[in-house]
């Protein structure tokens, strides 16, 4: 087991996609930004407390910039609190068969209780594509512009490795480099995971 770092945000997005699919929210719905969210360390969009961000921009901020402030905004708006949202994330993980995964926050910022495995992350990568194919396409977004600033995707395989169509990178000092990658060639799809490479 290791710290999933920003691969955590795949599950955060899974719950956003669930809410979109069940029509609880739409892409144009607005999430309110709390003071607590603005205090999250980078990587971030530097949102202002009291402002709003649309669901679509929140998704793109996680996919490209891996913004920690936005992950907290999502958690607080969908789960009432980040702690409660993390419980929902863990519950969903168990439901998907991710038996060795526990979430404590929505961003992947260091927390000793937030742990997963390469196998569980592969399970999540497969599940999010299978259960949310329409939204999964957003993981191949190469860049997005928010308030005049362009943010590019941290996944360097996009555009450089043929057939890559997602999904997410992660890094903290404690976890090392993490990656869940999705590649399709000649009708064959592979979901690969690199977990904790220093």
Predicted regions and their residues:
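Active-site-adjacent loops and short helices of periplasmic peptidoglycan-processing enzymes
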Residues: 1-119, 128-130
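Domain-terminus/edge residues, biased toward the C-terminal soluble/receptor-binding domains
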Residues: 98-102, 110-198
């Amino acid at each position: 087991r290791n710290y999933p770092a920003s691969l955590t945000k795949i599950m955060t997005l899974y719950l956003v996609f669930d809410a979109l699919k069940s029509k609880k929210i739409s892409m144009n719905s607005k999430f309110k930004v709390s003071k607590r969210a603005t205090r999250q360390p980078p990587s971030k969009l530097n949102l202002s407390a009291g402002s709003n961000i649309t669901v679509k921009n929140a998704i793109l901020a996680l996919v490209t910039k891996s913004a920690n402030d936005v992950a907290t905004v999502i958690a607080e708006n969908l789960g009432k609190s980040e702690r409660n949202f993390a419980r929902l994330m863990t519950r969903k993980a168990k439901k998907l068969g991710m038996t060795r995964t526990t979430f404590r926050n929505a961003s992947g910022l260091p927390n000793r209780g937030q742990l997963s495995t390469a196998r569980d992350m592969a399970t999540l990568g497969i599940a999010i594509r299978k259960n949310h194919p329409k939204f999964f396409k957003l993981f191949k977004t190469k860049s997005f512009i928010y308030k005049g600033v362009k943010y590019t995707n941290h996944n360097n395989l996009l555009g450089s490795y043929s057939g890559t169509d997602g999904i997410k990178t992660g890094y903290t000092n404690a976890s090392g480099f993490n990656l869940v990658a999705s590649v399709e060639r000649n009708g064959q799809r592979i979901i690969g995971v690199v977990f904790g490479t220093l």
